[in-house]
Amino acid sequence: RETVLANEVAPYAATDNVLAASTDVGDVSWKLPVAQCFSPCFAVGTPLHTWQLVSQGRTSIAHKGMLLAAKTMAATTLNLFIDSGLLQECQQEHQQVTDTQPYHCPIPKKVTPSPLK
């Protein structure tokens, strides 16, 4: 029988393929290195952006998966604080990418957000 949740860590595979998805980090990722983590929060094969996926968000599985992702990212951050060489490698890789693909913000400089009311 197939499992309904991912139950293994996929091996690292270097690739230049882009994962076409949206995130909330946009401009930030052009200023400093960012991380992304996938963890099992819903049944394998559930289409994204559907009510079926949303309905799984209140389950203990989703909660445990989110905690796993948070712990993974926190441990990664701790490693960067502990190992300054690793942090420098991340910064150098980021610099190499942004040097060859400079970022230009699509929002004109004269545009400013209105104050919250």
Label every model-predicted segment:
Residues 1-117:
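Metal-dependent amide/peptide-bond hydrolase catalytic core
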